[in-house]
Amino acid sequence: MDKQWQTITGKQVGDSYFQVRHPSGLTILLYPKENSSTTYAILGTRYGSIDNRFQRSDEAAPEEVPEGIAHYLEHKLFESEDGDAFDRFSKTGASANAFTSFETTCYLFSCTDALYESLEILLDFVQAPYFTEETVQKEQGIIGQEIKMYDDDPQWRVMFNYLKAMYHSHPIREDIAGTVESIAKITPDLLYRCYNTFYNLGNMVLALAGNFDAEKVLEVC
């Protein structure tokens, strides 16, 4: 199927990058730099911590999910029935990570070699959710410790105290990771519902910058 290419040139520095609309609906941004020794890739979805109330369609009833579920979902996507995505990245030499913000969740890696193999891993694990009662409950302790760590961070607490003072009802006032109490309510069914709502390719963007062949990247996608 045809892909829609567009070349975009930045007004400030004059560099150009390619924007491609993949037949799957995925938006792909490509910034080839031949002299770069490291290549960076990031796959993001427009889904963050503030999206805890949503409708899956105009006909569907509104849904409300526990605070921190977007961040919880980010953690759980790295785990599959066959193993851990970090282990797969280690075999290609790539350094991988992820983060959740108020409005987005992103999965990323950097590498100096085996780019296309690493890209396949990224696209594979993000599109292959695997949640069970056992694995979801196990993660509660891990994320609970992360929440307590941020509770001891003065800068983090000042920021959220400020947001709570400014916003009396908007979900931006709540911690991105949720609370120990809210994450205890998260179930595999809730994770699948959020995944199926927000992790569709039309709601996602893939961006690469570094030394690569744009056509080969699109072949992987």
Name every feature range the model reports, one short phrase each:
Residues 1-85, 192-221:
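His/Glu-rich zincin catalytic helix
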Residues 1, 21, 80, 84-221:
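Charge-rich, well-structured scaffold segments of protease-associated domains
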